[in-house]
């Protein structure tokens, strides 16, 4: 590698770190909890350690009534988001929860926050939302919370492109299609009209990927596997999701495109039928603003589940020593039979420390089929490892 290339990579890493450190990056989770719960097999004695992201999936896992869920994230913004969701459950008003996170907007959000929600938040989350509760106040240019945060800004750009091209009615027909044939028809009509030269250029830029929470390591993994690079990967992933999987319950892409959920297409934590059940269980969630390694050093124990999202990708290339140390602590704190779930933009297993494979059994027989029906569809692989 040339000295110039090394400098460029360092600048890219610094850019990514500056974007994701304290900004709200993920306003919703991008891992399918329906797949997760089938793989995890949670029960009443489960002690879960997971990365927070937007907190949607932690709430979903509560439906299986685990003993405790430790949500760990080095970004305080992500934990603040989960704490606000928990506050809405503690406030005992389903309609308010739906307004904030189902519709993504609430008239008078600031008044509601100070009168009803702020008292439920820890000091760090209070500081965050004191300055940003207006994210839920609708306006013409930013009509939804789901167009806020760094990933939300890119979603807004796609949304505006759809509106400008007059494609929104067709998009709704696509999302509400009755069968795969209808989905394929509308997708083939719409897809070429979304991607102009500017969008194609933008998707190749490192700053765009940083806004979406995609580090340079993941980008390289994708480009190594796909001849057409990142753009080809994105377009082929979208084609799979929009033409080969039913969209009627695909709330991930509905909220990304429209900025809102519907009662029939939303995460479980927003479904009215689960509100009181989750309200009784949200006290089982604990948030920790630190790295996973720091959490394990401060909170040793025998945990039954680790949910690592795509975090391993972030360390694999640039911080192999840190990756190895993290795995040593995971294995040291894992109970026998512990289930470890993670995803990757490539074939991450080849990047894991050698000693890991002595202690784990990878269940590709379980993950291969479920990965194909994952409603998000933007990861190259899903991995479930069971501690021997």
Give, region by region, the residue ranges found by the protein language model:
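N-terminal, Lys/Arg-enriched amphipathic/low-complexity engagement segments
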Residues: 2-38
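Class I S-adenosyl-L-methionine-dependent methyltransferase module
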Residues: 2-4, 77-275
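Conserved alpha-helix/loop element of class I SAM-dependent methyltransferases that forms part
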Residues: 24-47, 56, 323-324
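Conserved class I S-adenosyl-L-methionine
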Residues: 44-53, 69-71
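A short acidic, Gly/Pro-enriched loop at the edge of an enzyme's catalytic core
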Residues: 46, 290-308
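A short glycine-rich, Lys/Arg-flanked "PGG" loop and its adjoining helix->strand segment in the class I
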Residues: 321-336
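Conserved beta-strand signature within the Rossmann-like core of class I S-adenosyl-L-methionine
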Residues: 336-345
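Core SAM-dependent methyltransferase catalytic element
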Residues: 365-388
């Amino acid at each position: 590698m040339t000295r110039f290339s090394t400098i460029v990579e360092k600048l890219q890493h610094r850019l990514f770190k500056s974007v994701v450190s304290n900004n709200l990056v993920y306003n919703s989770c991008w891992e399918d909890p329906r797949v997760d719960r089938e793989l995890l097999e949670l029960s009443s004695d489960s002690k879960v350690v997971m990365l927070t992201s937007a907190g949607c999936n932690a709430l979903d896992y509560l439906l299986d009534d685990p003993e405790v869920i430790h949500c760990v994230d080095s970004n305080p913004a992500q934990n603040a988001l989960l704490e606000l969701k928990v506050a809405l459950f503690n406030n005992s008003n389903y309609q308010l929860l739906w307004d904030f996170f189902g519709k993504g907007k609430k008239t008078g959000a600031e008044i509601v926050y100070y009168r009803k929600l702020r008292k439920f938040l820890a000091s760090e989350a209070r500081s965050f939302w004191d300055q940003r509760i207006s994210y839920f106040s609708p306006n013409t240019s930013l009509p939804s919370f789901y167009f806020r945060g760094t990933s939300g800004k890119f979603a807004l750009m796609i949304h505006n492109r759809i509106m400008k091209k007059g494609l929104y009615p067709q998009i709704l027909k696509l999302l509400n299609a009755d069968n795969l044939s209808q989905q394929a028809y509308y997708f083939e009509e719409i897809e070429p009209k979304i991607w102009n030269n500017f969008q194609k250029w933008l998707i190749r830029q490192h700053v765009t990927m940083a806004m979406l929470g995609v580090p340079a390591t993941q980008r390289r993994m994708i480009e190594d596997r796909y001849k057409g690079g990142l753009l080809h990967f994105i377009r082929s992933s979208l084609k799979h999701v929009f033409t080969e999987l039913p969209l009627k319950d695909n709330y991930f892409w509905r909220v990304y495109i429209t900025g809102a959920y519907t009662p029939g297409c939303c995460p479980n934590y927003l479904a009215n039928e689960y509100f009181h059940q989750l309200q009784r269980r949200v006290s089982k969630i604990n948030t920790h603003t630190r790295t996973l390694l720091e959490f394990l050093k401060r909170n040793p124990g025998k945990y039954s589940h680790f949910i690592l999202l795509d975090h391993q990708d972030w360390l694999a290339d640039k911080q192999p020593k840190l990756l190895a140390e993290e795995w040593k602590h995971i294995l040291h704190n894992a109970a026998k039979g512990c289930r470890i779930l993670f995803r990757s933009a490539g074939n991450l297993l080849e990047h894991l420390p050698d000693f890991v494979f002595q202690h784990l059994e990878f269940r590709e027989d379980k993950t291969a089929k479920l990965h194909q029906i994952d409603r998000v569809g933007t990861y190259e692989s899903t991995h479930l490892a069971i501690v021997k």
